[in-house]
């Protein structure tokens, strides 16, 4: 069978999902799980964009031993230098350099002629090649670029030393036959004295990212880019787990295999969903809760007689266990640590002590603590510790019909407490009014969403909030058994994110 490379951009393009911002530790943990899953290449970040991204890419480069690490760069020498410095200690460093090629980008964003663009490609790809053995070039918005000019751009990049050409459907504009034809034309017309790998990077604006990626494979692409669970800006990226299982289940048609360990797929999906704070839709292909459920009586009858009547793959193939051994109030530190390890978390001993205390609190309230509860526990702890303040106490009191009084005490990382009291038409409004008095930043609540982490009346609640301050949007996530406490935690994190943003602008936080 032929082999195709899997290029994961969860930590770069995936993190551009509105409301998603991975911490340093979360990025490192995800990178380790991606390597365990078996991806060939990880796009660890955009080093020139921020010190945080640079540090994360550097740490990932120094940690991974089997997976190539890529840094993204614009066609600018300073960007390329930043990638070099961040990835120079990687075992397999790669550079991904890009510049837009479509008429609308040339005219309105870059203010360049086609000739100037080709000169820019030559200059920066050749500079990148002087620092890296492997250079990938992407003509941004390739699918809205005239095909003849796209061939010129790619030929120019190949002549300058690029050995990987990535074709991005940046705005999810293309459809399978058109996208596949782009690869066919490029492979037939671009000449090279060295081997060139063609890669596909699709967005899901029209719901065609996976279909377009498969069409690219059918027309010669040997590298596919995407993100776990298909996360990414706007409608998201190609869902890598869907491509992987599509190739495996229909290997009779494609004749192509990946290096992915398919039984690590569900664990990888759950880990990313937990850190991103985005629940996987129940009907999501491959990893959704309903992916292996059968509701129809006819389907159930057939499935019970022979599973293959209505299942083209087994839950075990993607790592879904037929039975789960839940933790309980009698579970000790060792069992809890082992569960964290099973779920893909690489957590310091100090943090494990903190998490174990919270776990015991949950176990006292629930008969069984499921894997989803543990994911929620880690996620909630991560969001709380990343916030500038933590919720110390929360008290509510009925004042009169429709009016509640809330007393909130927040604590900063140095242990200083900030009390506040307020009233409001309802408990949530009262709590948020009290928090507003502490942060002193008038905000507008744009979205408030509450979901149950698990089934049952004893389930933990996850609250996602979206607020606007000074015209900018901030997000927060809170997890707790108590809905009001989860709501308060989410609102505090969103306001903390605004505080951190303001500090960065003032030069306080790098």
Curated annotation (Swiss-Prot):
Pathway: Amino-acid biosynthesis; L-leucine biosynthesis; L-leucine from 3-methyl-2-oxobutanoate: step 1/4. Its cofactor is Mn(2+). Keywords: Amino-acid biosynthesis, Branched-chain amino acid biosynthesis, Cytoplasm, Leucine biosynthesis, Manganese, Metal-binding, Transferase. The keyword Phosphoprotein does not apply. This is 2-isopropylmalate synthase. NCBIfam families: leuA_bact, PRK00915.1-3, PRK00915.1-5. Pfam families: HCS_D2, HMGL-like, LeuA_dimer. The lineage of its organism: Bacteria, Bacillati, Bacillota, Bacilli, Bacillales. One of its GO terms (molecular function) is acetyl-CoA C-acetyltransferase activity. Its EC number is 2.3.3.13. It is found in: Cytoplasm. Its main location: cytoplasm. Homodimer.
């Amino acid at each position: 069978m032929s082999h195709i490379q899997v290029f994961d951009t969860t930590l770069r393009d995936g993190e551009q999902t509105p409301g998603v911002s991975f911490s340093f530790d979360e990025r490192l943990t995800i990178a380790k799980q991606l390597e365990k899953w078996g991806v060939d290449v990880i796009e660890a970040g955009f080093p020139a964009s921020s010190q945080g991204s640079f540090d994360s890419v550097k740490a990932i480069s120094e940690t991974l031993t089997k997976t190539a690490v890529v840094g993204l760069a614009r066609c600018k020498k300073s960007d390329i230098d930043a990638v070099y410095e961040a990835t120079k200690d990687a075992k397999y460093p790669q550079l991904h350099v890009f510049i837009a090629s479509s008429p609308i980008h040339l005219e309105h964003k870059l203010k360049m002629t086609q000739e100037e663009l080709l000169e820019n490609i030559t200059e920066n790809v050749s500079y990148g090649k002087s620092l890296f053995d492997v250079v990938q070039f992407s003509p941004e918005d390739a699918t809205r670029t005239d095909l003849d000019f796209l061939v010129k751009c790619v030929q120019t990049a190949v002549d300058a030393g690029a050995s990987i050409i990535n074709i991005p459907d940046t705005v999810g504009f293309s459809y399978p036959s058109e996208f596949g034809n782009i690869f066919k034309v490029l492979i037939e017309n671009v000449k090279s004295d060295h081997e060139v790998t063609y890669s596909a990077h699709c967005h899901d604006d029209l719901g065609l990212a996976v279909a377009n990626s498969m069409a690219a494979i059918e027309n010669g692409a040997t590298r596919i880019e995407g993100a776990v669970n298909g996360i990414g800006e706007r409608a998201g990226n190609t869902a890598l787990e869907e491509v992987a299982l599509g190739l495996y289940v229909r290997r009779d048609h494609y004749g192509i295999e990946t290096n992915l360990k398919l039984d690590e797929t569900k664990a990888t999906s759950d880990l990313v969903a937990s850190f991103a704070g985005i629940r996987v839709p129940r009907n999501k292909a491959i990893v959704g809760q309903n992916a292996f459920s059968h509701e129809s009586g006819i389907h159930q009858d057939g499935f019970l007689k022979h599973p293959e009547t209505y299942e083209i793959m087994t839950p075990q193939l993607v790592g879904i266990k037929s039975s789960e051994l839940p933790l309980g109030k009698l579970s000790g530190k060792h069992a809890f640590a082992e569960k964290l390890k099973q779920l893909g978390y690489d957590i310091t001993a100090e943090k494990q002590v903190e998490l174990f205390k919270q776990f015991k609190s949950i176990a006292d309230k629930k008969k069984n603590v499921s894997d989803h509860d543990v994911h929620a526990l880690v996620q909630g702890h991560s969001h709380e510790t990343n916030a500038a303040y933590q919720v110390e106490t929360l008290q509510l009191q009925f004042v009169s019909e429709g009016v509640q009084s809330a007393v909130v005490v927040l604590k900063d990382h140095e242990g200083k407490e900030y009390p506040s009291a307020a009233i409001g038409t309802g408990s949530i409004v009262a709590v948020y009014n009290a928090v507003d008095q502490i942060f002193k930043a008038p905000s507008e609540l744009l979205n408030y969403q509450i979901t149950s982490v698990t089934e049952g009346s004893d389930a933990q609640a996850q609250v996602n909030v979206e607020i606007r301050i000074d015209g900018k949007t901030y997000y927060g996530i809170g997890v707790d058994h108590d809905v009001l406490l989860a709501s308060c935690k989410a609102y505090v994190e969103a306001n903390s994110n605004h505080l951190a943003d303001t500090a960065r602008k003032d030069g306080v936080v790098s």
